[in-house]
């Protein structure tokens, strides 16, 4: 796996699923391939994205700044600086300075990542902030190692939280989660169907599913009534793809 592929993988792991994630993936690909070299426009685009947490925006801004060649005097962005200040906690800053001194002696991506993984996400973000604000300089490889370690820490906590929700025995939470997943799947079906004539059937199924979820929420239904809703939708989607000559069995 190439270095940039690894960086893209880690960064995308902390971005919530949805159309915006696909857009960010495309931007990262373009930046890494050298097809997008307008850092100013990229940062302006990133700043106005909804849904993303300030920290995720800060990490993406840091990655864009590391990758896109820019003039020395280009202004640092406040939204990235604020996100990478470790919540203003002096302990984070102290640890970030210690980490930075270790990273300065390191020259490889994997070496930097190993060192960084023993620090908290707050200290890692603060260390990125030091480098972003030009208070410290490390090689690009080392900076990418720091980025990936930070993303791994964040993704770990997101995964724990997600696992707790999936494993919950509370029927109301499980019911709502199934309806949210069904609704999201229906949206994805509508996007994939596009505007071809054969798409009408898939669009109809997706539309009915969304209406059904809305009705279930409006009238309040038994928690078990949503069981299998997403799987039914996915079966419909796969049947539609088969008719279109597409063989993809990786949705479940």
Curated annotation (Swiss-Prot):
Signal peptide range: none
Region RNP-binding: start-end pairs: 165-252
Q: Which domain of life is it from?
A: Viruses
Q: Mainly resides where? A: virion
The keyword RNA-binding is assigned to this record: yes
- Positions occupied by motif Nuclear localization signal: 101-105
How does it sit in the bilayer? Answer: Peripheral membrane protein
Tell me which stretches of the chain form a coiled coil: none
- Please name one Pfam family that this protein belongs to: Flu_M1
What are the BP-aspect GO terms?
viral budding from plasma membrane
Query: What is annotated about its quaternary structure and interactions?
Result: Homodimer and homomultimer. Interacts with NEP. Binds ribonucleocapsid by both interacting with genomic RNA and NP protein. May interact with HA and NA. Cannot bind NP without genomic RNA.
Q: What does this protein do?
A: Plays critical roles in virus replication, from virus entry and uncoating to assembly and budding of the virus particle. M1 binding to ribonucleocapsids (RNPs) in nucleus seems to inhibit viral transcription. Interaction of viral NEP with M1-RNP is thought to promote nuclear export of the complex, which is targeted to the virion assembly site at the apical plasma membrane in polarized epithelial cells. Interactions with NA and HA may bring M1, a non-raft-associated protein, into lipid rafts. Forms a continuous shell on the inner side of the lipid bilayer in virion, where it binds the RNP.
Q: Which family does it belong to?
A: Belongs to the influenza viruses Matrix protein M1 family.
Further comment? Most abundant protein in virion. When expressed alone can form virus-like particles in transfected cells.
What is the name listed in the Swiss-Prot or TrEMBL entry for this protein? Matrix protein 1
Q: Which organism is it from?
A: Influenza A virus (strain A/Memphis/1/1971 H3N2)
């Amino acid at each position: 796996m190439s270095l940039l592929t690894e960086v893209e993988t880690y960064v995308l792991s902390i971005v919530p699923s949805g159309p915006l994630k696909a857009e960010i993936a495309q931007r990262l690909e373009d930046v890494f391939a050298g097809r997008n070299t307008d850092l100013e426009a990229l940062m302006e685009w990133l700043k106005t994205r909804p849904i993303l947490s300030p920290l995720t925006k800060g990490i993406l801004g840091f990655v864009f700044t590391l990758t896109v060649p820019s003039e020395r005097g280009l202004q640092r962005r406040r939204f990235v600086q604020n996100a990478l200040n470790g919540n203003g906690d002096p302990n984070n800053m102290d640890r970030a300075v210690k980490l930075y001194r270790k990273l300065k002696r390191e020259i490889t991506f994997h070496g930097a990542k190993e060192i960084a993984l023993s620090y908290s996400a707050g200290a890692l973000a603060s260390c990125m902030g030091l480098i972003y604000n030009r208070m410290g300089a490390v090689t690009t490889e080392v900076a990418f190692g720091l980025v990936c370690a930070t993303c791994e820490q964040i993704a770990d906590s997101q995964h724990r939280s997600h696992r707790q929700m999936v494993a919950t025995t509370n029927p109301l939470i499980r019911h709502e989660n199934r309806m949210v997943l069904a609704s999201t799947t229906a949206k994805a079906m509508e996007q994939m169907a596009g505007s071809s004539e054969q798409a009408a059937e898939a669009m109809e199924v997706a539309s009915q599913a969304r209406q059904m979820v809305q009705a279930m929420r409006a009238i309040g239904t038994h928690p078990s009534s949503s069981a299998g809703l997403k799987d039914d939708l996915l079966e419909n989607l796969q049947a539609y793809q088969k008719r279109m000559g597409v063989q993809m069995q990786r949705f479940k």
